[in-house]
Amino acid sequence: MFSVFIEHYKNNEKLRLFTTIIVVWLLSRIVMQAMVPVMNLVADTPHNLLYYMNPWDAEWYKELAEEGYKLPRSSGMANWAFFPLYPMVCALIRIITGGYINTYAIGMLVSNICIIIAVYYAVRFAWLELDTDKYDRVDIENIIIFLMFAGPCAVYYGSMYTESLFTMCVVLCFYNTKKKNYMMAGVSAALASATRIVGCTLIVVLFTDMYVSMYKQHRDEERRIVAAIKAFIKDVISDAGKLLALAICPLGIFVYMTFLRGFCGDAWAFYHVQKAWRTQKLFPVIGVLIKSCTGRLGEMSDVKQINGIILGWLCVFTLLMYVIMLVRKHYACGIFGIIALMIPLTSSVMSTLRFIVGSFVVYIGITEALLLTGRNTRRVIMVLLAAAEVICISAWYFWDGLLM
């Protein structure tokens, strides 16, 4: 009986992939739990896993799941800064379970289910996106699974934060786009746009893929770019399915804006309330990066000087990696990655780590970079990345603003 299962396991790629994902996920969560008593040794007051895993915005999502949207606090902060899909899912499970389960535990359950699904389809997308004639499929699989469960900042995916749900939607959008299933890609983008503001920009993924397909079809024409653009426009207009897929991409944010219009009279309330968090005004992107990288954010900044320097340079290197991805013809990944990072950089470097990780495409860039190294070098790098994740978990448990 056992030998039959082993044989089936070896021959069934989907089962093998899912099993590997579950094992690595479980090991990563054991590490997170094991670090709780270690943290309690140095903490002023001992706490449990639910406390350590859910700092900052998790409190807002807990409030949303339990009480819904409310009027602003005296500080000017309001929970309508946070998009509705994730807390709605948590609220639904809370209702189904009769409120007997801790809301943080529900949020973590949702996040963990979403990230497992995300990693499964992330591997399948990576197989399609990366050159499997050049790179080994198992190596691609192992690196993606490692990065998303044990790489730096993977701790986000276990918390009551939107990162897991958003990443799942992004991955499904990329995967379905690559498979030319544009309608499902559009639905995934719509769900992403109801989860975080960056989600509405996933429309560029569909646009890019459709255009590149047309560009390849006109490779023999002299004015190739012009011909491809004309063919692309004609194809989209004449294909109701593609047109609808593109149209529904920002549906989530439009529905939320309609709700806000009726709730507080301001469809852009989620944007306007951000000034309660980001008090410093800097020139978008360039000014933010220059001030951050040179440690000149000033006293008005919500980010510590050292954290600002680290985040600033991480953003610079990440943007450079996205440019390299464009050069290596990962067009949709590179374009979306740049846009997804530009949005927070219009005002601050705060939370940019979450935007980088949540956009998912960073994993494709890192995976290809690791595949280009020798096996021994790759193993050393992955050990260092795992050590960095342990540091990230420690920083997260102690509410370090670097990971905010």
Task: Give the location of each predicted region.
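Transmembrane alpha-helix segments characteristic
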Residues: 324-346, 352-355
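Short hydrophobic/aromatic helix or loop-helix immediately within or flanking a transmembrane segment
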Residues: 55-70, 75-99, 286-293
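Loop-to-helix entry region of an early transmembrane alpha helix in multi-pass inner-membrane enzymes
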Residues: 80-84, 97-117, 156, 302-312
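Signature aromatic-anchored transmembrane alpha helix within multi-pass, membrane-resident enzymes
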Residues: 246-250, 372-402
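Multi-pass, polyprenyl lipid-linked donor-dependent membrane glycosyltransferases
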Residues: 114, 142-177, 184, 191-202, ...
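Membrane-lumen/periplasm interface segments of specific transmembrane helices
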Residues: 28-40, 44, 53, 192, ...
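Transmembrane-helix motifs of polytopic, lipid-linked glycan transferases
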Residues: 106-131, 317-321
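Transmembrane-helix signature of polytopic, membrane-embedded enzymes
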Residues: 101-105, 122-150, 184, 331-335
